[in-house]
Each structure stands twice: as structure tokens, then as C-alpha cells.
Amino acid sequence: MKFLCLAYGTEKDWRSLPRAEQDALLAQDEILRQRGALMGAVEPNVTTVQAWNGKPETAKEPFPQLSAPLAGFAIIEAENLDEVVALVAETPCARAKGAIEVRPIMILNDKEWRNFKK
């Protein structure tokens, strides 16, 4: 079985940990990567798309309606945010009083990203 693990936390809390503890936690991430886990994190900026009336509307914040459960996910490759908005505007959740939250993905397995964080 594979699991999608949605991790919640803040950069502020991460940075408040002692460096030794951060290193230990990053070592655990490396163990997961060696086991073949696909690991990623979302950037803090978010775009929510709604097309309730057939026309895409966007907001630069998460979908506030907590009564709507997570129904699914997709990883979409696109040239830019406008292309993604156009692609998801016609999906069931965007049209049926739900929303699609769009966040750029940072691939943690990418060596360039790991070098950037050092």
C-alpha cells in the first residue's frame, strides 16, 4: 500500500528547532527516500480555483470552506499558473461548488533543492 501523507507545519516552527534536531529529522527523510518514497513539499503561495458559474475565478488563499472534504488530488505539469487554472476550471470539484487548491511543488529528492536549503 502507498499512502499520501499531508504534513502540516510551519517554517517558523521548523527553524526554531535546534540544528542537531533538524539534522536528525532530515536523516529520517533520507531513510524514506532510500526506501523509494516520493517526497515533496508545497510552496507557501496558493491559488484556489472555482468555476461555479462556468467562468474560472481565482483566490490567492486556501479554500476556506472546511465542510468540503478533500476529494482527490492530481499532479499536473504545465508551463505556468494560468495554464493550470484553465486545465482545472472544468473539473468536477471546481464546477460543483468545491474548489481546486493549486500549489507549486518543490521536489525534495532534487539535489539542486537540497543544495539550496544548506
Q: Model-flagged regions — what are they?
A:
Residues 1-118:
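Conserved, structured core segments of small domains
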